[in-house]
Amino acid sequence: MRARSLGWLIGSCALACALAACGDDAARTPPPWDRTLPDARELGIRRGLSPARGIVHLHSPYSHDACDGRPRDAGGAPNEPCLADLRAALCATHIDFAALTDHDDTMADEDFATLFSMRGGDQPVTNGGGEQIASRMTCEDGHVVTFTIGGENSLMPIMLERHVAGTVQARHDTYNGEDAAAVAAFRAAGGLAWVAHTESKPIEMLRALQPDGIEVYNLHANIDPDIRADYLGLPPSGALAAAAEFADTNPGHPEPDLAMLAFLAPNQPAITKWHTLLGEGRHLPVTAGSDAHQNAIPIPFADGERGDSYRRVLRWFGNFVLVTDPRDPVAVKQAMRAGRLFTVMEVLGTPVGLDIRASSGARTYELGEVIPRAEGAMLTVELPVVRGLDPRLPVPEIRARVIWIETPTGVVTELAAGTGPRLDVFLGAPGAYRVELSIVPRHLGPYLGDLGPALAEAELPWIYASPLYVE
């Protein structure tokens, strides 16, 4: 988001560092914290579809406010150390696709191919017409990250295949558009029309835009005092005070990567608008937006890394599409458009074994698909477990909910809820059916050090799956 950076966190974090008390050296030490994420395929391959982990809403040195407000040098060259941090973070967190969404200042001023920031052995990906639509970076461990180009201003076009049409000034005007004409221009450029910061967008605007998808969660919204107060109905300063505790570098400090536990909460206005549009019969996938700029907390935390490092933010959560080839940007975009995706707050744990499907006779329906009403189907939710959970740690509590948004009334009903290992629900009435999982992350309590385990005793949103539809 361009309105303001998160730099106002710095003072709070510095104060916490100065005031933090020393820890108890006798406290039990938990197993080492994993600063990375596993290959997405460890979540489980189902019916020939592999999960591909993606970041949707990500800023590079081609956003004017990235990299502590210094994304380019005096000669216009990108901030190479900041770019290197981004590239290393994508490798450490095993991101399969990085949907860059830079602000029009300065993204609109550059040739499209320049925006991929290809370095070293990166390879271009072209379409049938020879246009570069993506690039691939191979990490030291052989993992491949696919980059695509988009923008984030009032709207958020993603996975463009070329710049929108017109002169440089016309590009700026279109990227800053917020009407149906802008949406049409994004699609004409081969992209998807997404909406970031759903919490602040009027429902009338969303109806008129008819976007391809929206954010159901945005990190910046959960932290910014103004957004919390004006749009989320949350205490404006609560997130800052709580998150500042994780800047402690004294013995007994909490694991810095768990700072998100201090402010993670549902973006309820975004969820309500999603339900409203689903109740009107729209098909609408959702993502969670990292909104990462590496421009907010330059002070080092106890792990020696700045508080808002790309690696830390990308470690917190991502979006998973189900595809036959995780390296194919066309397949990824098709899955995004179709709604074959779900979001995961991976700071709470990587879910292994999750499967959401509907079955009717020999036919299986995936997320985003339409089930004929006359046919009916059985929705099955196989609840996941937390990957690699050390037996010495407390056991988390995982709960799934099946939510029906009826069309055309818009009535929202919880059809089933439980801790598993499986839920089965018949889908017969028209509407959208979505699955949401929450977790009480008790296994993280020992990593909270002198803060104590209270933050790990709260029920937190873990997974939002895009709906299936009965029509």
Task: Locate predicted features.
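C-terminal motif of bacterial Sec signal peptides marking the signal peptidase cleavage site
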Residues: 19-21
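Catalytic pocket-lining loop regions of alpha/beta-barrel enzymes
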Residues: 214, 250-253, 334
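A metal-dependent hydrolase metal-coordination microenvironment
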Residues: 30-238, 255, 265-269, 273, ...
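Bacterial N-terminal signal peptides that target proteins for export
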Residues: 1-12
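C-terminal functional module detector
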Residues: 25-51, 63, 102-108, 275-471
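Acidic/polar low-complexity surface segments
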Residues: 242-243
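Active-site clefts of carbohydrate-active enzymes
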Residues: 246-260, 284-290, 294-295
